[in-house]
Amino acid sequence: MSIAVIYGSTRINGNTEQLTEHVIKGLEVEKIFLRDFLIQPIDDRRHTEGGFTDVDDDYSELVERMMKHDTFIFATPLYWYSMSGTMKNFIDRWSHTMRDEKFPDFKKQLGTKKAYVVAVGGDNPYLKGLPLIQQ
């Protein structure tokens, strides 16, 4: 089993990172800290004639690294009943990747992966994390 841990927190050694370290203790993983990369927000052009245009950032490199693994652990703080903005930007860009010739069968390949979520919240995290998990 090959595991990629995708960290969505901007805080170095914050609560999300500390809890995730307990979860992955003893496992061999590749750690991907989204905060260390430039990920532009999606410019949604799914329904335009020209479609998506190339974006000059680090996103494609991150997708390539992630897709080498068969299991993903998404680690994120809970902000306003959802994932961090950093994580959201990364996942939103998947819409672009599903139409990118550099990543043929991206959606199909995602369907073969296992995914887990480590979500860290302050007050009432079970209630506030529910919308994230139900998405």
Regions inferred by a protein language model and the residue ranges of each:
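Short, glycine-/small-residue-rich phosphate/pyrophosphate-handling segment
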Residues: 103-135
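N-terminal beta1-alpha1-beta2 submodule of the flavodoxin-like/Rossmannoid cofactor-binding fold
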Residues: 1-104
